[in-house]
Amino acid sequence: MKKGRFLLRLGAVVALLVTFSLTGIEAMGVVKQPVASGEPRADIIMIDSLKAFGKLEEVPVAFFHDQHTDALKKQGKDCTACHETEKDRLSTKFKRLKDVDMGSVKETYHANCIGCHKEMRSAGQEAGPTDVSCRSCHSRDVKASSNWKAINMDKSLHYRHTASDSIPKGGQEANCAACHHKFDEQTKKLIPAPGEEGSCSYCHKAEVIKDVKNIRNASHIACVNCHVNVAAQKADTGPLTCQGCHSAEMQGKIKVVKDVPRLKRNQPDAVLLTVADTKALTLDSKSLMQPVAFNHKAHELANDNCRACHHESLASCAAECHTVSGDKKGGFVTLEQAMHKPGSQSSCVGCHNERKAAKDCAGCHALIPEGRTSEASCASCHAEGIKLDTVQIKAMSKEDKTAMASAMIEARMPAGTFNISDLPEKVVIADLKDRYEGAEFPHRKIVETMYAKVAKSELASAFHTSKGTFCQGCHHNSPASENPPRCASCHGKNFDATKNARPGLKAAFHQQCIGCHTAMELEKPAATACADCHKERK
């Protein structure tokens, strides 16, 4: 251990257990930001366990977990060198199962860490500090920087776990039960939850709540124990080091399954979204929203995990948290806000806006003012012609709603665009000939190229509701027509402050064309290469 003087007295004894850490172990926190210049590492754990008893007297100790793991491995030792077992699972705490008091916890670290270092030194091996100088371990001078990165259990990684034959019992149902459970009030034990599986974070939060472990400890206990047990059977398993899970380099080497089979857990293919909070509605409700046919199956394919929408539980948004008027369970976020808030990644509109920011879509959408809505855009989701009052909503069964949603989704037809051959092949923009000749715009080629990028997008198909919708990316504020008016019919030669600060014709052309090129990350023509579009006049 060449950097022994900077290793904490926690010593060479902490084993593999923390290796799958999502955020750290027990009261120790993984450093998420660089703590100093030097070698980047994903295994820097700041040991600050004593803060549970009050203000720390010394700065936390920076502990390089993987470096100690390697040292233990050379000695033929494993996780049990540092971690005791509880109910056949290794505890995340160092050399103890419970924190009794500050003195005993402090003594546990000092005695075992320094003791281990002394043993190694006596055996002629390199080791960490063995003296009693506090600054040998409690130092602000950490010769490393953190490159720790959270790991995401996406669909591919989840599928590899459910389909794995390496998990002790094997088979999908058994594999699910290895991680997913619920608390049985009668037996006061954790039991499997077939058909009710949800994200771990639905129950395990960032902090400990009553007797429920936080997500940090729950993840380490479940994941690391499984990896260690599978590795002991000489079978393929997940990472056994912090670096293996939490460095960007190693995450980039994780095998990705491209076509992940749909995981069927009794979820619906289609959902009819209505105002479920019928208690807040009266028979004469004037603002009752029209139903939305939600393609649940398509959204599963478009997202890495269920938490993209179900961020607290698998129950429907309106039934569980978000009511018409707002409720404490939903953070007082109303149903309308949960669905429509533009800047939220958890709302429908916010998520769609994020997808529209992709370069294939941004050429048009980056130039459309946020928040612009119309009856046509609302009708993309809220079905026209289907009027349901409060009485009808209350009378509909779950099966009726599913059938109606499925029929509405089936009836949706992609609008496409106008016949390409009917569009002008070229358009010469010559309104402002001065120093340069008019710009020859390859209209048909550009339409074909841009449309090909979104033609297979289900999101685009759902919201491009007429053949002219696609054209309105350029021909904005105009009727969706095969023959839209010329730009000069709205944009005068000069800036007009009296008409919503409408830019002049020259500015409008450059803003539209260069703005689109920039949003789509096109290198040519460059914004400053005037002659690439306009031939200079002789």
Outline where the language-model segments fall.
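Short Cys/His-rich micro-motifs in 6-15 aa windows
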Residues: S139-A144, S247-K253, V324-D327, P369-E370, ...
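Cysteine-rich micro-motifs
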Residues: C113, V132-H138, G198-C200, C223, ...
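Bacterial N-terminal signal peptides that target proteins for export
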Residues: K2-A12
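Sequence context of c-type cytochrome heme-c attachment sites
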Residues: G29-E126, K143-P194, S201-A231, K255-H311, ...
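Bacterial N-terminal signal peptides
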Residues: G11-T23
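Iron-sulfur cluster-binding cysteine motifs and their immediate structural context
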Residues: A81-E84, D131, R135-S136, A178, ...
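Repeat-solenoid scaffold signature
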Residues: A222-E249, E354-M396, C530-E536
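Short, exposed beta-strand-loop hairpins at the edges of beta-sheets
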Residues: E119-G128, S139, A231-A232, P369-E370, ...
